[in-house]
Regions:
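Sec-dependent N-terminal signal peptides
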Residues: 1-3
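C-terminal motif of bacterial Sec signal peptides marking the signal peptidase cleavage site
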Residues: 6-10
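A contiguous, well-ordered beta/alpha segment that forms the leading edge of an enzyme domain
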Residues: 11-164
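Short, conserved phosphate/pyrophosphate- and ester-handling motifs at nucleotide-, phospho-/glycolipid
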Residues: 168
Length: 169
């Protein structure tokens, strides 16, 4: 019986190789760990993809990103392709906001800016300033429409999006 038990443990898989790296992307420090034979290569690929998504799509502070352009659209309708990541993420954000009865609000970008969360200088905005900024928030100010060719997105009444609350997860 003892020999049988020992033979079973010998048949188990050995611990997988792992590689860990600390990465700064999306205004956040992240620890990535990848397991498997090609862990280092997979980690390199994951880090590259994170930076690409951040800079090209999800950053609201990088002038070349899709989200930056949408936030700067001043209420103009923006067209997106059917396979674009941004409208799918906006749809998910709106769904989560609805499910949480507004506790999660992706339209708080101006409020976050007022506090200085994406800048080097933090400050406490006045109650009047916050009241004014909050008048431009709420998911009702995001018009997301599925079209035959993809999506259209319109941010109404000065609304701006920050998708950091879900883009990282």
């Amino acid at each position: 019986l003892t020999i049988f038990a020992l033979s079973l443990t010998a048949c188990g898989e050995t611990a997988a190789e792992s590689e860990t790296r600390t990465v700064y992307a999306m205004d956040t420090v992240m620890n990535l760990t990848v397991y498997g034979e090609n862990a280092a290569a997979a980690l390199e690929s994951a880090e590259k993809e994170l930076h690409t998504l951040d800079e090209a799509v999800l950053s609201r502070t990088a002038e070349g990103s899709e989200l930056y352009a949408l936030n700067a659209s001043n209420g103009e309708t923006v067209e997106c392709g059917a396979d674009d990541i941004l409208p799918a993420l906006i749809e998910t954000a709106l769904t989560i906001s609805d499910a949480t009865e507004g506790a999660f609000d992706p339209t708080l970008a101006p409020v976050l800016d007022a506090w200085g969360f994406t800048k080097d200088e933090r400050r406490v905005p006045s109650a009047d300033e916050l009241k004014e900024l909050l008048s431009h928030t709420g998911c009702g100010k995001v018009a997301l429409e599925k079209t035959a060719d993809g999506w259209t997105v319109t941010l109404l009444d000065g609304a701006q999006l920050d998708l950091g609350g879900i883009a990282k997860g």
